[in-house]
């Protein structure tokens, strides 16, 4: 598959270079049909091979695979049509440009086919890991030796398959550290499993021995932790292997067991919080409190595991903030319960308890969403929750529900503060000046509105007939929701709500499965939450659809919205029927089917609504225009205020400026002269991205400066590495000048040179007697080849899109990765050569 991918990448690169060269030189373009026919054959063969593997693909990805395969064939057909058009009218540049577009689409879809298959394999592997973990938990519950032997056999079978598949995944990693880590964890799983099973047998032989039970529990905990570490490392390998690729769909990563536990514990905690007042009335308050504390502690402990693993510093900061909030609220809840338990008629105590219950529920929901979301989605989810609280406050006041209004209002100040804090954290990840300005303005607006909302809400609650207060509150809430909408984009809101809808649907099914006297009450509440989330998701998607100008893409988004709209009443009806009679198997079957389709529709909507590069550019353009307008207004005001003073001292200022310019010019000329003396052979290009790429090339040159360049394999390898550094520097210069052909040519030269480097390095490795040094050389050989192929694909596919921040980041990351691989390859080859010279001659 990789060979086919590289072959198609080379063919696409050649086609792009040929067409670009013809356009630049204004020459007659030759017949591309024969070459396109070869591309078409390779593409169709790959698509057919992918379709034959449908039976082996997880059902979640079958639709994506079939759709991508179909698009791939269509793109190949379109490329052929454009090639024929270009042959019939060789001076017409339009079909040539259409051919470039179709060729790039082919390459993107080929990459997607590979990724879809990999995702499916990972999901199967993770499911095996979770089944093995469930078996480990069941072993801890068994005290009959025969039953234990049966369960151990099942677990061993799962773990053997898990280790075998893990080793296969490690072989596909481009990162030596992750590959080694996965192998070590797989070994640890085997060791801990044997120890745990032996301990479980000891317990069966001596069931009353508490020491043995304690040892079994300790080993079980370590084994489950190791299995979860294995799942997390598999996720990291996939993310590391695909960080250079723009996915056409939003990949929904598999969840670790710690992430699953956060979600499950949140559902238990929220269920207990909702029924807490009834439990207190029935005299079960202390027992309910214990359940709440246990669920909160379980959610917090697993969330801490997720936070400690998190490699994104901004997301980690957000997670720790959410964890601290739930930690703070749990003892507050217990304290608020005590006066109610002592005096159930204390209205003030009851009101305070309900406020703390509401805040704790919100904190738990937010944490459950955050562990499986990106920083932008965490902020969007917080904004959705805050906007819903504001709407609920207004509705409660309008309906005269003073008690509920007071409960919601008690939570809103801290909710606004929390949202502002999360938005400020998100600012750390944003470099676009327009977007930063927009978010800062929205934060300032929320800070201004917060005291006004509290004041007007208190007035309206105290006097429902105070129409002025209600009018002002409505206006303030409208402004606050607008500010919230300026912090998070609609597509981020849709993705955040997709996570919440999935979590709530899973909790609903779990609630029905567990039954109990409060099942219907809990189920109705889940149904309300789900319906509200779907409504908000549709509203956000419709708002974004109105901004889309591409008719085909707009239709795709609207079709996805319509599909979710149709399913919503079906879902609510299925929930109603199942809650009315949980034992009705047909009703349950319908509910499971509708839940599955709603999840798919919600996920599909969150995928198709993700913005294209053109849409992101348009958003950026509008923000920049707004900044320019504001800056122009501010400058005009400043000029009007300073005009009189400037006229009075204009002569003195002009003289100062003239002298300063002369002095500055002298300094500039002197600095330029000094710079010319020290200047490298290549001029450092302008722009942070181009400088970063040039810097990566300079790192290679500096690292090799003192190396010997002779006719030995190591000397030849160093000379070839010099050539790679030279071509990387040229890519930076070509990118600065917008030279597409130059970038592609330089990338291809790097790929060709890397192959020569690999030849020399493998020669050194073959003659090295130290296995560890030999493996290091071969590892960095593979890394260099992977990075050069990714660079070649990136320059071919994204060559016209380098104003896109994502493309810029990918170019810099790829250049730095290639630089590091080349430097480490030379170092490891040098070490291997030294080891070789120490071998005595025969």
From Swiss-Prot:
InterPro entries with a match to the protein in the record: Alpha-catenin/vinculin-like_sf (IPR036723), Talin_IBS2B (IPR054082), Vinculin (IPR017997), Vinculin/catenin (IPR006077)
Keyword Hydrolase: no
Cellular component, GO annotation: adherens junction; basal cortex; cell cortex; cell-cell contact zone; cell-cell junction; cytoplasm; cytoskeleton; focal adhesion
Description of the deletion phenotype: Cytokinetic defects when knocked out with mhcA. Aberrant epithelial organization and localization of exoc6. Mis-localization of myosin in the tip epithelium causing actomyosin ring malformation in stalk, which appears significantly wider. Distribution of Golgi and centrosomes not polarized. Abnormal intracellular distribution of dcsA.
Family statement drawn from the similarity comment of this UniProt entry: Belongs to the vinculin/alpha-catenin family.
Subunit structure: Monomer. Associates with F-actin. Interacts with aarA, ctxA, ctxB and rgaA.
Protein name stated in the entry: Probable vinculin
Lineage: Eukaryota, Amoebozoa, Evosea, Eumycetozoa, Dictyostelia
